[in-house]
Regions:
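P-loop NTP-binding core
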Residues: 1-273
């Protein structure tokens, strides 16, 4: 089983970050729907919203205005993860919500680092998540569309990374920069970090371009590319505005089936079916 263990040898949940500094590639949609689909298969899942925009938070049914404490409070040391986690209305799925305050956390962490040379600004999230990870089978992190300190904290805390890639022209643009960031994290901060997989998103079967992009990405990443391809669908785009994952919003849709298939692949790759 490809899972981390604590000092007692007990299996702890796998932490997977969804990362791509390009916006609009289906990162948050995948974070929400992969989390919900894993939960549907009986996995205990914590969805961690690290994007200050908070779309993963609203996408599982919470109003940003009602959030009293968020992952920001975990970062600044005023709360533990267990104080902030919210139970969603979906079985086996919990949320660590985001807030707009998170937008300034990079600067706050840098300032703390200047004031205290022993302050480890890249390890704040890892140390906090390690305290709760044995309560979950998976912790899925929705990263912001940037490679700043928030994302660095996510990569340092994670066992692996899923890169969502849109099936469109310039799909691989910025991928080299992202892979360099992952390699740098491996070298300096988290030698155990691995590439979990590459997910093709927003595929339009009506265009030849989409098929060309799939071939290009498969030749580049080989077996790391998931068999599952996420289609471009109106129902998938609508679901977050209703505060529901696609498997709750439209269970019989192609989008719902695609994310259930992806969850199955993730479970199989990690040997915890």
């Amino acid at each position: 089983m490809n899972m981390s263990k604590n000092e007692k040898g007990e299996i702890m949940g796998k932490i997977i970050s969804l990362v791509n500094q390009k916006g609009g590639v289906g990162k948050t949609t995948t974070s929400i729907n992969l989390s919900a689909s894993l939960a549907m298969y009986g996995q205990r899942v914590l969805l961690l919203d690290l994007d200050p925009q908070g779309n993963a938070t609203t996408g599982v049914g919470f109003n940003k205005g009602d959030i009293e404490r968020s992952v920001y409070d975990v970062f600044n040391g005023t709360a533990e993860v267990s104080d902030v986690v919210l139970r969603t209305k979906f079985k086996n799925l919990s949320l660590l919500p985001s807030s707009l305050q998170l937008a300034g956390i990079d600067i706050e962490l840098l300032e703390k680092g200047r004031e205290n040379p022993t302050f480890q600004k890249a390890f704040q999230l890892r140390d906090k998540l390690n305290m709760v990870r044995e309560n979950y089978d998976y912790i899925i992190i929705d990263c912001p569309p940037s490679l700043g300190l928030i994302t660095t904290n996510a990569l340092t805390a994670s066992d692996s990374v899923i890169i969502p890639v849109q099936c469109e022209f310039f799909a691989l643009e910025g991928i080299t920069q992202l892979l360099n960031a992952i390699m740098l994290t491996q070298k300096k901060l988290n030698p155990e970090l691995k590439l979990e997989g590459v997910l093709l998103t927003m595929f339009d079967s009506k265009t030849n371009l989409g098929i060309e992009v799939i071939e290009e990405i498969r030749s580049y990443f080989k077996e790391k590319v998931y068999t599952t391809i996420i289609p471009r669908l109106i129902r998938l785009a609508e679901a977050p505005s209703h505060g529901k994952p696609i498997i709750a919003y439209d269970p019989k849709s192609k989008g719902s089936q695609a994310y259930l298939n992806l969850a199955k692949e993730v479970i199989e790759r990690n040997g915890n079916a």
